[in-house]
Amino acid sequence: MHLLAILFCALWSAVLAENSDDYDLMYVNLDNEIDNGLHPTEDPTPCACGQEHSEWDKLFIMLENSQMRERMLLQATDDVLRGELQRLREELGRLAESLARPCAPGAPAEARLTSALDELLQATRDAGRRLARMEGAEAQRPEEAGRALAAVLEELRQTRADLHAVQGWAARSWLPAGCETAILFPMRSKKIFGSVHPVRPMRLESFSACIWVKATDVLNKTILFSYGTKRNPYEIQLYLSYQSIVFVVGGEENKLVAEAMVSLGRWTHLCGTWNSEEGLTSLWVNGELAATTVEMATGHIVPEGGILQIGQEKNGCCVGGGFDETLAFSGRLTGFNIWDSVLSNEEIRETGGAESCHIRGNIVGWGVTEIQPHGGAQYVS
């Protein structure tokens, strides 16, 4: 619409110019509108600036100016668009070339990757379907699963019971760790015992005594070892009273008891310690403190010259006399040691450890001190 109005005005001005001689066409210097970079070398022709323009003249001048501006604007826009289009074509061409070069050889790899992904997807779907079928089957058979689980648990219980049985058999049949021999007391008899001959005198102001015991039968008083003199047959005693352990120093009135610590048919490691200065007395069972007391036989000194025996108590001075069948031990003894000092807690634990029978006392040392069996007692391995 705007273009039609411009054309109409242009035709109308041409008709008026032909029929009228009164109007002189005036050309206006447009250098002030658009600077084309050309500057005149001569002075411009002076115009009749003082002449008044009619309304039509002003209209024509405005039309000419607007047409020129429009043509120049269209030309500039066309130039800009052409340049931009050319630049875009060049960039697209370069991009196409760069993409074409690496993609051409990579097409087979891309095809292989696509195929592998398809296979993986299919395998995943198949696995999901199989899992769903398994879950469905498992949901349909809860009772069967429960029975299978119960059978496994029962088998585990039986295995545990078998293991306990084997451990019990080993405890009954084997010697303690590190011990190669033991003395067997086959029955209770006043003739069955073992006589011990210390390597040093038994004059003691403190001592520690340890022994491994496996009893087959226990009464109210079953002697493990006993040391006594003619004056006092009960200087030192360690004996069993059913499942309890009794430790005596200086007489039967001085005793320490550890309740319910022994099981028949099983090896048990026992230690007793005592010192005269404080009367501190302790009983240890399998490396653990079972009982302790103070002021027991304080100031007492164990005299030398007595008789030391295992498996029996001698309450007389003469050979062959003073034995009591009810006091006799039946079972096995090993690892009997006596020290003339109080062992530390760690040392006591070591005497019942893997090398227990290789740790020897300085008064009585198992394996080096003479221990003579009597009346049917014998060394076994």
Swiss-Prot record:
Coiled-coil regions listed: 74-101, 143-167
Gene Ontology biological-process entries: extracellular matrix organization; host-mediated suppression of symbiont invasion; inflammatory response; innate immune response; negative regulation by host of viral glycoprotein metabolic process; negative regulation by host of viral process; negative regulation of glycoprotein metabolic process; opsonization
Location within or outside the cell: Secreted
GN (gene name): PTX3
Signal peptide coordinates: 1-17
Name of the protein this chain belongs to: Pentraxin-related protein PTX3
Species of provenance: Homo sapiens (Human)
Induction (UniProt): By IL1B/interleukin-1 beta and TNF.
InterPro entries, per database record: ConA-like_dom_sf, LamG-like, Pentaxin_CS, Pentraxin-related, PTX3
Carbohydrate-modified residues: 220
Cystine pairings recorded for this chain: 179-357, 210-271
Domain Pentraxin (PTX) as annotated: residue spans: 179-381
Physiological role: Plays a role in the regulation of innate resistance to pathogens, inflammatory reactions, possibly clearance of self-components and female fertility.
Annotated GO MF terms: (1->3)-beta-D-glucan binding; complement component C1q complex binding; identical protein binding; virion binding
Any GO CC annotation of this UniProt entry: tertiary granule lumen
UniProt key word Hydrolase: no
Description of post-translational modifications: Glycosylated.
SMART domains documented for this protein: LamGL, PTX
Main location, first listed in the record: secreted
Oligomer status and interactors: Homooctamer; disulfide-linked. Binds to C1q.
UniProt KW keywords: Coiled coil, Disulfide bond, Glycoprotein, Secreted, Signal
